[in-house]
Swiss-Prot record:
One CC-aspect GO term: small ribosomal subunit
Pfam families to which the protein is assigned, alphabetical: Ribosomal_S7
Name of protein: Small ribosomal subunit protein uS7
Gene expressing this chain: rpsG
Organism (species): Klebsiella pneumoniae (strain 342)
Signal peptide: none
Record keyword Cell wall biogenesis/degradation present: no
Family of the protein in this entry: Belongs to the universal ribosomal protein uS7 family.
Amino acid sequence: MPRRRVIGQRKILPDPKFGSELLAKFVNILMVDGKKSTAEAIVYSALETLAQRSGKNELEAFEVALDNVRPTVEVKSRRVGGSTYQVPVEVRPVRRNALAMRWIVEAARKRGDKSMALRLANELTDAADNKGTAVKKREDVHRMAEANKAFAHYRW
């Protein structure tokens, strides 16, 4: 690690349709092989479907879905005296968003629906209703942290 200075986070340009940095990050996570316009088309189509189902505007519905997947605690491995402990630590806000988005995209890719836009829309709808694979993933992470609460004093 460099000792001189801390390098700041890169600024992400907000997405052209809604002007949201969060949505731009989501598009970047979904993007494969640098095909951003394809990723944008998929996300916008999914958000349109989500908005029709939920009755809210696209950005609001996306925020609700993302909020239900964001983890508050996770476990990190810590080696102490020859044995490894899973130590629960709080998740930083930037990482919360990144994990939530990654989990939603992974869950959508594993679904068996026809198009990616439909898979993503279904996963976001499930996330907004507090069900689905991405929400289950968050619950599993929280359960792991709760189970290993005894090792919280090993935090660094």
